[in-house]
Amino acid sequence: MSKTILFTGGGTAGHVMINIVLIPKFIEKGWRVEYIGSKNGIEKSLVQNVKYNSVSTGKLRRYWDWDNFKDPFKIIRGCLQSYNLIKKTKPDVIFSAGGFVSVPVAIGAWLNRVPIIIREPDSTLGLANKIALPFATKLCTTFPQTGENVSNEKKVYVGPIVRVEIEKGNVLRGRRYCEFQQDKPVLLIMGGSQGAKWINDMVRECLDTILLNFNIIHICGKGKVDPSIGMEGYMQFEYIGDELPHILNMASVVVSRAGSTAISELLFLKKPMLLIPLTNSSSRGDQVLNAEYFSRQGYAEVILQDRVSTNTFIHAVNKLYTNKEKYIQNMNGYKKTNDEGIHQIIDIINEVVK
């Protein structure tokens, strides 16, 4: 009789990508695989080829909002839905990639006495995973320092995990996609899965100067492309899907937010990166800590947006390119492979199911 695994996680692409990597591995091994996500979350559009079950979710906010009064009831409803769904599905194990949708699933798993393994993509535990941790059998971490107060029996450091498609990127295909007229280094600018207005505005203020030395690929986010800008060597996209691995491989240097998924892929590809993390006022501070860790390891240059002018931004980009070989050399020292991390998680899941 085949085993059953449920995956959960969502809210941002970073809380889905690890599941997209793992799902085919379990399908290949003959497991029955299903997914639990939110009704309208990004995970619904990203997860394919498995049965998708939606449950009610409430967003876990750290700021005042009237929805904070409604969301506890949504979470309670989601717990009941998760409990019934897990009871009906009878999974052998559940794997959670975090995000607010995972909280009711973790509680539902505990009530059904089904083991749940949670994975934290960032350098500190997110609120959802903090809530889920007491119900979890194992915690898999991306950074070695994550969960310092969690017992070694429960915590396992597995390192960054990236999509296998990233390995298959082709530089020539990326060049054909962009059709740049001049042979210059390529600067890729990414603002995360939601885009980043601050980065978009800063880049556009500096375009004239940066284009003297670089071709620019700018991933702006949905609804954030500026059609009035038609400068040679500057290409804007709301989002890049299947072509992204080719674009990443083509890029000489990258400017990015400091979400774990993005910077893990850049580390895997050995791409020198200028990280501009979300500020503590805009998030729980995880991106700042991610960026600081990469900076300490010598993988990235970091600037904080509340201390940046157009001149300092331009200087940071030029400095990154000038010193790119130093960053590549430092990243070559990172020895943990993608396959190693994937197999480590699979082994943990198999061990828990025994």
From Swiss-Prot:
HAMAP family: MurG. Keywords: Cell cycle, Cell division, Cell membrane, Cell shape, Cell wall biogenesis/degradation, Glycosyltransferase, Membrane, Peptidoglycan synthesis, Transferase. NCBIfam families: PRK12446.1 (NF009102). UDP-N-acetyl-alpha-D-glucosamine binds at T12, A13, G14, R163, S193, Q287. GO terms for cellular component: plasma membrane. One of its GO terms (molecular function) is undecaprenyldiphospho-muramoylpentapeptide beta-N-acetylglucosaminyltransferase activity. It catalyses: di-trans,octa-cis-undecaprenyl diphospho-N-acetyl-alpha-D-muramoyl-L-alanyl-D-glutamyl-meso-2,6-diaminopimeloyl-D-alanyl-D-alanine + UDP-N-acetyl-alpha-D-glucosamine = di-trans,octa-cis-undecaprenyl diphospho-[N-acetyl-alpha-D-glucosaminyl-(1->4)]-N-acetyl-alpha-D-muramoyl-L-alanyl-D-glutamyl-meso-2,6-diaminopimeloyl-D-alanyl-D-alanine + UDP + H(+). Its main location: membrane. This is UDP-N-acetylglucosamine--N-acetylmuramyl-(pentapeptide) pyrophosphoryl-undecaprenol N-acetylglucosamine transferase 3. CDD domains: GT28_MurG. InterPro entries: GlcNAc_MurG, Glyco_trans_28_C, GlycoTrans_28_N. Cell wall formation. Catalyzes the transfer of a GlcNAc subunit on undecaprenyl-pyrophosphoryl-MurNAc-pentapeptide (lipid intermediate I) to form undecaprenyl-pyrophosphoryl-MurNAc-(pentapeptide)GlcNAc (lipid intermediate II). It holds the Pfam family Glyco_tran_28_C. The keyword Zinc does not apply. Its EC number is 2.4.1.227. Pathway: Cell wall biogenesis; peptidoglycan biosynthesis. It is found in: Cell membrane. The keyword Transport does not apply. It is an enzyme of class 2 (transferase). The lineage of its organism: Bacteria, Bacillati, Bacillota, Bacilli, Bacillales. It is a peripheral membrane protein. It comes from Bacillus cereus (strain ATCC 14579 / DSM 31 / CCUG 7414 / JCM 2152 / NBRC 15305 / NCIMB 9373 / NCTC 2599 / NRRL B-3711). Belongs to the glycosyltransferase 28 family. MurG subfamily. GO terms for biological process: carbohydrate metabolic process; cell division; cell wall organization; lipid glycosylation; peptidoglycan biosynthetic process; regulation of cell shape.
